[in-house]
């Protein structure tokens, strides 16, 4: 699993009420060292800017995501965070996020993720 997919799972657990300090270590242990820093940046940064990013995301979506799709919401939030606050090229963020949507087992969300991140 890459850092983007792992961050979606970690953030979804945090949105469900688990603390970041308990949700992050199991996923950080499963990825290589070069991706671990990226995972931590995506998780901490997304949560730091969560209120602003969530308002922005609500403006992009025609209707809210279902509660069972928290991983997709987390993927969108981490993608928007990275687009706004990192020097990673936008095309790379969009491509990684769309690929992660499919690897999360939600291929229907690829077009949603693509559209939301392209408008960011």
Each predicted region: which residue ranges?
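N-terminal interaction/assembly modules
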Residues: 1-63, 80-81, 87
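Σ70-family region 2.3-2.4 aromatic/basic alpha-helix that recognizes the −10 promoter
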Residues: 37-40, 108-115
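An amphipathic alpha-helical micro-motif enriched in hydrophobic residues
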Residues: 42, 74-80, 113
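Conserved small/polar residues in nucleotide/adenosyl-binding loops
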Residues: 119-120
């Amino acid at each position: 699993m890459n850092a983007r997919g792992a961050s979606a799972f970690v953030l979804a657990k945090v949105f469900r009420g688990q603390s970041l300090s308990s949700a992050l270590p199991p996923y950080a242990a499963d990825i290589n060292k070069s991706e671990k820093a990226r995972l931590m940046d995506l998780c901490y940064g997304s949560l730091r800017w969560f209120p602003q990013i969530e308002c922005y995301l609500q403006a992009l979506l025609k209707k809210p995501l279902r509660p069972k799709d928290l991983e997709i919401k987390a993927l969108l939030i981490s993608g928007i965070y990275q687009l706004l606050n990192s020097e990673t090229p936008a095309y790379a963020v969009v491509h990684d996020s769309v690929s992660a949507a499919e690897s999360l087992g939600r291929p229907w969300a690829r077009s949603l993720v693509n559209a939301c991140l392209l408008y960011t």
